[in-house]
Amino acid sequence: MVNTNKVKGRMKELELTQADVAHCLNIAQPTANQKINNVRPFDLDEAEKLSHLLHIDAGEFGKYFFTQ
């Protein structure tokens, strides 16, 4: 599961929108919304692309994309 609060907080810090995330992942904005809000899962490729967009380093990756 995605740590929704961390992802949304990082998006806010970088002034990114769900449309920006959707463009990065080559998906529709409603799909990006569902993934960010844990309605649909991210696959590993999408998580890696989003981590680059959000400037998340490898040491922080798990805090954003592997929550219980």
Role assignments for model-derived ranges:
Residues M1-L16:
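A short, Lys/Arg-rich alpha-helix, primarily the initiator
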Residues K8, A19, E48:
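Residues within the helices of the helix-turn-helix
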Residues G9, Q34, K63:
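DNA-binding alpha-helical recognition surfaces that contact promoter or target DNA
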Residues M11, A22, S51:
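The alpha-helix within a helix-turn-helix
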Residues I36, E46, F65:
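DNA major-groove recognition helix of helix-turn-helix
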Residues V39-K49:
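Short, basic-rich loop-to-helix N-cap that marks the start of a DNA-contacting helix
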